[in-house]
Structure formats: structure tokens, C-alpha cells
């Protein structure tokens, strides 16, 4: 874990031991960062410097990279690499069923 880690709200955060965290990460509540349980490979999730992760996010996979200066929007699901200097949000669609 790099210096400058900020956790504004300390509830519901899960970070797997195979995660490398750069400097100045902002990590918000109800977020999970991890890989598959039981995976014993050397793969790691790498989070760059100056990354901002919104609330209620899920970042999973065997080997993922979040680049420097990336922003992950609230309620995002990440199962692929995110390049540096970008903002990522998961587009959500809702279905309303009328009775």
C-alpha cells in the first residue's frame, strides 16, 4: 500500500491480499477489490497512483491493472484493465415491470 491512502467512510471495504496499491488512492465504502478465492497463482491486481474509486464498486479478476490518475465511478463493476488518465463508469440499464 502506497502512501496517502484515504478511506472517507470505513464500512464494507474488502481488499484481497494479492492487490498492489499505489500512492494517493481514494477508496470509498462498500467496495471489493479481489481475485478468485483459491487462486494460488502469482497474478495480482495493480492499482496505480492517484486513483479515485467511488462507492459500491467491485474490481475482480486474476490479473487486473487500474492505471495512474484513473477515476472509477460509483457502483462500477470492473473485470478488465482500466488505462491511465481516464474515467470509467458502468452503464446501467433498468427494467421496470408493470403488473
What are the functions of these language-model segments?
Residues 3, 8-17, 22-23, 27-29, ...:
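Left-handed beta-helix
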Residues 92-95:
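Conserved switch/coupling elements of ABC/ABC-like ATPase nucleotide-binding domains
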